Amino acid sequence: MVKVGVNGFGRIGRLVTRAAFNSGKVDVVAINDPFIDLHYMVYMFQYDSTHGKFHGTVKAENGKLVINGKAITIFQERDPANIKWGDAGAEYVVESTGVFTTMEKAGAHLKGGAKRVIISAPSADAPMFVMGVNHEKYDNSLKIVSNASCTTNCLAPLAKVIHDHFGIVEGLMTTVHAITATQKTVDGPSGKLWRDGRGAAQNIIPASTGAAKAVGKVIPELNGKLTGMAFRVPTPNVSVVDLTCRLEKAAKYDDIKKVVKQASEGPLKGILGYTEDQVVSCDFNSATHSSTFDAGAGIALNDHFVKLISWYDNEFGYSNRVVDLMVHMASKE
C-alpha cells in the first residue's frame, strides 16, 4: 500500500485523509501544516460541519496525530522543500494547500524525499488526470501530476460518454457551485476579481472557472469545443454542472439516458453515477462519485441540442478521486 504525506490540512487535506481511512486504499503517514498545531488538528479532523463527526478515534499522542490507532507524523514547515517526507516514509505527497500548484513549486516536495506529488487543484503546467477519463495515459516518468478540479472531475466523465456515443460539436458549461474557502463571509477586497469579494452567504456570484476548458486537456478531441462559467451560491457544499451542447449525431433524450446509465454500471462505475430520483443538492452530501447524472433534470430542445445536469460533492467526491489516482499511480510502480 502506498505511503502518503498530506501538505495542507484544509478542507481537501482533511477529507483526503478521511477518504484514505474510509477506503483503506492508501496509508497516510505524515501531514504538514504550519498554521494548525497538533491538538487543533485533532479537533478539526474529528468535527466537520459539513460531513459530520469522524466515525473513528482521533487523538494526539507523543507528538503524533493518531487516527484509528495509526500514528501519523506531523510537520509544521512553511517551505515545502524543508519537509522531511522521506524520514516519515511518505512516498507520494498530496499538495492540498492550493498555493504550490505549478511543477516548480510542487517539485519542492521531491527535495524532502517524496517520490511523486499529486496536486489537488488544476495546474498551469503539470499534466492533469481525471479518473475514468484519461488516467490510463499516466506513466511512470511523471513525478508531478494534477488531479484537475472538482468541476472538471464532474464534467469530464459525462462529456466523455456523450462525446464517445454522439459526438460533441460544441458546448457551454455552467456550474452552480457551493461556497469555498476562497470566498468572503461579508463584502471585502478581492484583488482584481471584484465580484468574488462580495458576501458569500448573501449573493449569487458569477465567477470564472477553467473547468470546461480543462476538459480539452484531458479529452484532446474536445479541445476548443467547451468553455464555461460558474455561479457561486450560498450553500456550504455540493455543486451541479449544467452542460448544454450540440450533438453531431441525432439522439433522443432517452438514448442519452441509456448510454449514461450503461457507463455508470460499467466502465465508469464508482465515478459516474446515475439517478432518476427527484433529488436536490443535500442528497449528494458526502457522495463519493465524481459526478451523478440527473436523468430527470435534463432537457432536449431537439435531437441535436441538449442540456444535461450532473451533481457532485465538490469536497468529498473529489477527495476520493485523489486517493484513487494515487492507487492507480502506485499500480504502475
From Swiss-Prot:
The lineage of its organism: Eukaryota, Metazoa, Chordata, Craniata, Vertebrata. A motif ([IL]-x-C-x-x-[DE] motif) lies at residues 243-248. GO terms for biological process: glucose metabolic process; glycolytic process; innate immune response; microtubule cytoskeleton organization; neuron apoptotic process; peptidyl-cysteine S-trans-nitrosylation; positive regulation of canonical NF-kappaB signal transduction; positive regulation of type I interferon production. Glyceraldehyde-3-phosphate dehydrogenase activity is inhibited by fumarate, via the formation of S-(2-succinyl)cysteine residues. It catalyses: D-glyceraldehyde 3-phosphate + phosphate + NAD(+) = (2R)-3-phospho-glyceroyl phosphate + NADH + H(+); S-nitroso-L-cysteinyl-[GAPDH] + L-cysteinyl-[protein] = L-cysteinyl-[GAPDH] + S-nitroso-L-cysteinyl-[protein]. It comes from Oryctolagus cuniculus (Rabbit). The modification S-nitrosocysteine is found at C150, C245. The gene is GAPDH. Keywords: Acetylation, ADP-ribosylation, Apoptosis, Cytoplasm, Cytoskeleton, Glycolysis, Immunity, Innate immunity, Isopeptide bond, Methylation, NAD, Nucleus, Oxidoreductase, Phosphoprotein, S-nitrosylation, Transferase, Translation regulation, Ubl conjugation. The modification N6-malonyllysine is found at K192, K213. CDD domains: GAPDH_I_C, GAPDH_I_N. This is Glyceraldehyde-3-phosphate dehydrogenase.
